[in-house]
């Protein structure tokens, strides 16, 4: 009986030792982790481990972190905008020189589009540019006794600069076709709503011009038909 009691005590002692060792291991592991990453119960700060071995840390104020994303977005937007301007500039600059073949061809195409609109009695013209990021050129045309007043609207300052250098070429092109360029104005429409309104007005005017032309053509054909029709008179 005494021997059985000793065995029980020994087992209890061994179990306690094992439990203590296990607990000590857990504590050691926790201490190790705690040494690597310090936990701060403070909502105003966030700690990011930079180097766990050396236990180096970067501390950010959470209020400032909220400001970082808008700053990055703003810088990114500025970079995109800057790249877009450089991209447009890279396309426009080769056309600025009047000596280049491409510049002359471009000027001829714009002049042809304007002359075509005038001959069709359109009061507006739209010139598409390639690449599409250059936008379009909208031209308002006012004609009276073969005297033209033109207004150009572009989306980019670089295109406006090109149009400024293009005006003498257009003046000569119109003059060769018996049209005098009395006045011209070149402006930039950077506001989306303003440009959208102008586009809507452009297509609306084109629709009404086409409609009037079709009506006039139909009336002319009807008059010609009446003129050509012979009437036989029997007595």
Curated annotation (Swiss-Prot):
Q: Which cysteines are joined by disulfide bonds?
A: none
Q: Which GO terms describe its cellular component?
A: bacterial-type flagellum hook
* Stored InterPro entries: Flag_hook_Flik, Flagellar_hook_control-like_C, FliK, FliK-like_C_sf
Establish whether keyword Secreted is in the entry. no
Q: Which UniProt keywords apply?
A: Bacterial flagellum biogenesis
One GO BP annotation is: bacterial-type flagellum assembly
Gene3D superfamilies named among the record's database cross-references:
3.30.750.140
Q: What protein is this chain from?
A: Flagellar hook-length control protein homolog
